């Protein structure tokens, strides 16, 4: 029906099953991290018609920050347990959710926006050092 917003065509569980690469926890993390990122970039929702779009690069950075807030030094370990070891993994999850109509994208958005945004070891481990007194 024209003008009526379309809801998701599949459940999140179906999308997870169809992609077959990551557990549902990873998809839920990306959804929560997207909300975190949008709020950080655009602030609290004021105008419901205003664009709240974020780029793939912005989302990757937001997901990095969100993971570090949630898990600190264990962030990279938790993500690796879910099979997320590169920023491209975030992109695969996002685009699976787009295909299932859980998320929307612009014509300019592509999976390439998530390619090599940062190195996981540097991005998650660089700020943490254990200092041992000699």
Label for each model-derived stretch:
Residues 21, 39-47, 72-76, 103, ...:
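Intrinsically disordered or highly flexible coil/loop and linker segments, enriched in small
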Residues 22-26, 35, 87, 95, ...:
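Cytosolic covalent-transfer regions centered on His/Cys nucleophiles
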């Amino acid at each position: 029906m024209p003008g009526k917003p379309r809801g998701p065509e599949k459940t999140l569980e179906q999308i997870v099953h169809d992609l077959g690469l990551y557990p549902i926890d990873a998809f839920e993390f990306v959804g929560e991290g997207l909300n975190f990122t949008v709020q950080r970039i655009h602030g609290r929702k004021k105008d419901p018609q205003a664009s709240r779009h974020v780029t793939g690069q912005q989302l990757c950075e937001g997901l990095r920050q969100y993971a570090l807030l949630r898990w600190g030094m264990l962030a990279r370990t938790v993500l690796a347990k879910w099979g997320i070891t590169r920023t491209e993994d975030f992109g695969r999850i996002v685009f699976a959710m787009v295909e299932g109509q859980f998320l929307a994208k612009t014509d300019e958005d592509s999976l390439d926006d998530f390619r090599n945004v940062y190195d996981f070891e540097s991005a998650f481990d660089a700020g943490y050092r254990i200092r041992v007194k000699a």
